[in-house]
């Protein structure tokens, strides 16, 4: 199965982890990298790997961009990764041994790392994602953020062994930029404007849900940062949508 699979990656300025990522998928015969305007050494580093096919194009939102990148692959079986994700040895072996059928899709656990440590709680514990699929029976949806692979009706889901190691956050400045960027994408993608009082309530609940209900407090100071950042993201996406509506109507 491994040799019949194309690894598909979208990237922008992914030099920090691209070599580790590509070494983790070096046994795959094709790695499609779809770049969205990198200005660092991502391309130079990636071209050192003989199985890499390099493409460049505009970022259309995560769902549409990943769907386009998938269309560039030679194989129908797809392993979709982000540029800050690493395939574990156990997962690679699981894919190597896999004899999945076209009407099946692979569910993979993602282990999220925040400033050098795996997060167990805060809603960031090992999250199951469909990342291995046949493009004839499953596709990415059109969501601009928080995109998902959507299997066609009747496709069965198979749990694969191993994990994807996700370097979610390497430094706090990067994290804040990501929160800001995601909130802008959500605000521009038809998010309904809310009254400021409701925005405040949603912001407080986002913190409470992450820190208390999802046990972020057990992740120590990292859990606190994640909880505050989640609340911050909720506040900014709604206030940006609200401001956009007010300016438009003024």
At which residue positions do the language-model features occur?
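Catalytic phosphate/metal-binding cores of nucleic-acid and nucleotide-processing enzymes, i.e., regions
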Residues: 12, 37, 60
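Catalytic-site signature of metal-activated, phosphate-bearing donor transferases
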Residues: 64-70, 77, 81, 88-248
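A conserved acidic beta->alpha catalytic loop
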Residues: 15-16, 24, 35-44, 82
